[in-house]
Amino acid sequence: MNIAVVGTGYVGLVTGTCLAETGNNVVCVDVDEEKVNKLRRGEVPIYEPHLDVFIERNIKQNRLTFTTSLNEGIKDAELIFLALPTPPGEDGSADLSYVLGVADHLGKIIDNYKVVIDKSTVPVGTAEKVKLAISKHATVNFDVVSNPEFLREGFAVN
């Protein structure tokens, strides 16, 4: 299966790498060019036992790639995982601007059916907001799934 993971923080990098390790073709997308270049070289910016081995193996087997281009990252993807930051706003609520910004952009660029899976830690009702943001521009069918991740760092791969 062809999969895109948008965001290469802890959740995104572990998710993308483990999906590649199970035989999927995964493109991880991040706006941080320096981080993407390091990941392409197999330099892992987080601590997670065995993750570096999985990243190196899957890069060599061409199942795991990294890009700064959302368009490039999602063009062949059947599934698009959103693993984006949701920092607390001034009032303590989750700031959804990264998630909704990417959703809006996805609506402009998807050209065939996609399943968008939100792995970010978000409040109830966010999937509907993501769906609305995509649907403002989308001319094709898509579905949105909420699948928040609560990983225990250092034990996520096991």
Model-identified regions with their sequence ranges:
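NAD(P)+-binding Rossmann beta1-loop-alpha1 motif at the extreme N-terminus of oxidoreductases
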Residues: M1-E43
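Short, well-ordered coil/turn residues at beta-beta hairpins
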Residues: D76, L82-L84, K119
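A structured beta-alpha segment of the ubiquitous adenosine-cofactor-binding alpha/beta core
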Residues: L51-E78, P88-G89, G107
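Rossmann-like flavin
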Residues: V157-N158
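Rossmann-like NAD(P)(H) cofactor-binding subdomain of soluble oxidoreductases
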Residues: P88-F150
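Short, well-ordered alpha-helix to beta-strand connector turns
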Residues: G23, D76-A77, Y113
